[in-house]
Amino acid sequence: MNNRKAPCLCMDHLTFTYPEQPSPALRDFSLTIRQGEFVVLCGPSGCGKSTLLRQLKRALAPHGKRGGTILFEGKLLGELDQRTESQRIGFVQQSPENQVVTDKVWHELAFGLESLGTDAQTMRLLSLIHI
């Protein structure tokens, strides 16, 4: 019996090139993350960490040419409906100054819940416990 958990995220031969740039920011990158794994992505400034992570959220993905595949829970990322993507894939910036909507991480998370139609009572409860 195989005890390995199914892949949660698979990036296969991912390549990304920004417009009008001669070389890719990401080149032939492959990664599989299984449910429950904890992964640290580190490297020097400008090596492509943010570019890579932004590929996971269509609303945040930079313009450019992408090759390769990204599977999330066995489905092509581009085929997920917006609600599923919003519910299952989060994105919080390292620096509060770079947050998409607000300047506090918990406000950013609450904005995501609000856009999914979470009721006001649940939102208040989460804000009380700073989640």
Positions of the model-derived regions?
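Short helical segment in ABC ATPase nucleotide-binding domains corresponding to the A-loop/adjacent helical element
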Residues: 97, 102-114, 124
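A short, flexible loop at the N-terminus of ABC-type nucleotide-binding domains that lies
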Residues: 2-11, 15-28, 60-63, 79-81, ...
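Helix-to-loop junction immediately C-terminal to a conserved catalytic motif
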Residues: 57
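Conserved small/polar residues in nucleotide/adenosyl-binding loops
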Residues: 129-131
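The feature captures the beta-strand-to-loop junction immediately N-terminal to the Walker
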Residues: 42-44
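Conserved ABC transporter NBD signature motif
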Residues: 65-76, 85
